[in-house]
């Protein structure tokens, strides 16, 4: 085998077996390309940590939240990353605003659309016999309908990027298999995530032929305001987000519709 053939063999091996795993890192660090992510709910908790870690990786971040003027930590980050961090107002239940922002960013490719915004609804509001159905509507609006609307509005931006990923922060609480083992709880939150998962699977099937990967990642029980009061052992946000970013890097068109736990294992439906 001559040298050219050897080089070709090595290139193909790396592309087929190593490339998908490290494609995001290679594109951002070795090719000079600067990827962009748009993150919802970026002012605190997991969304804020996503913002920090993607900025540290050299990405451009469009951080969205309902009240940017009150997002002190985001605004402090802006001072350190003036050229890489944009902070924009967005509430995922406001579909008109989603459309406005999509139009405003029409010339901006978005490599990873990161649907992070979510609410639990509060455990006391979803107890059988005393359920607050207005709260249920709110949970569905944020956790289920919001990510679908975001995906539809920002599809052109993702399509025009290099990495082409639509990622949603889901939960193992959306797994019917796990619910059967864990028992009844969190009616609103669980069902919102189960419905979200089905939407994202449908979206993955719809967009696979267009080269767009769709995936769901689970942070596990994480020590944030979102999880306050829940009787679970908690993981630090820094660790949870680092795990999810690693899993996002591994989601490609080949394994689109992936439903991935923080440890990299597939969550049963």
Predicted segments with their positions:
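Rossmann-fold scaffold of SDR-type NAD(P)-dependent oxidoreductases
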Residues: 40, 110-118, 143, 168-170, ...
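Conserved glycine-rich cofactor-binding loop
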Residues: 43
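N-terminal Rossmann-fold NAD(P) dinucleotide-binding loop
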Residues: 47-48
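Conserved active-site helix of classical SDR/Rossmann-fold NAD(P)-dependent CH-OH oxidoreductases
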Residues: 52, 148, 193-201, 205, ...
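Conserved glycine-rich Rossmann-like NAD(P)H-binding loop of the short-chain dehydrogenase/reductase
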Residues: 57-73
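The beta1-alpha1 cofactor-binding region of Rossmann-like NAD(H)/NADP(H)-dependent oxidoreductases
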Residues: 88-100, 133
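Catalytic loop of short-chain dehydrogenase/reductase
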Residues: 119-120, 127-140, 145, 155, ...
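C-terminal helical subdomain
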Residues: 209, 216-219, 224, 228-269
């Amino acid at each position: 085998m001559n040298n050219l053939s050897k080089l070709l063999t090595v290139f193909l091996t790396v592309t087929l077996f190593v490339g998908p795993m490290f494609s995001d890192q290679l594109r951002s660090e070795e090719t000079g390309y600067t990827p962009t992510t748009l993150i919802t709910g970026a002012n605190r908790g997991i969304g804020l940590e996503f913002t920090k870690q993607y900025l540290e990786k050299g990405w451009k971040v469009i951080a969205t939240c309902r009240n940017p003027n009150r997002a002190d930590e985001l605004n402090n980050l802006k001072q350190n990353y003036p050229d890489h961090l944009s902070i924009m107002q967005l509430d995922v239940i406001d579909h008109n605003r989603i459309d406005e922002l999509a139009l405003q960013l029409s010339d901006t490719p978005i490599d990873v659309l990161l649907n992070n915004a979510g609410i639990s609804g509060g455990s006391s509001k979803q107890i059988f016999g005393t359920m607050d159905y207005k709260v249920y509507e709110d949970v569905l609006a944020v956790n289920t309908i919001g990510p679908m609307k975001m995906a539809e509005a920002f599809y052109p931006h993702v399509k025009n990027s290099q990495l082409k990923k639509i990622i949603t922060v889901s939960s193992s609480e959306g797994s019917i298999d796990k619910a059967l083992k864990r028992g009844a709880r969190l009616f609103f939150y669980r069902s919102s995530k189960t419905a979200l998962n089905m939407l994202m699977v449908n979206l993955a099937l719809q967009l696979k032929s267009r080269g767009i990967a769709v995936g769901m990642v689970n942070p596990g029980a994480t020590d944030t305001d979102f999880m306050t009061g829940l009787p679970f052992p908690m993981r630090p946000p820094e660790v949870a987000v680092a795990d999810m970013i690693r899993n996002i890097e591994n989601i490609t068109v080949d394994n689109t519709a992936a439903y991935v736990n923080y440890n990299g294992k597939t969550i049963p439906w």
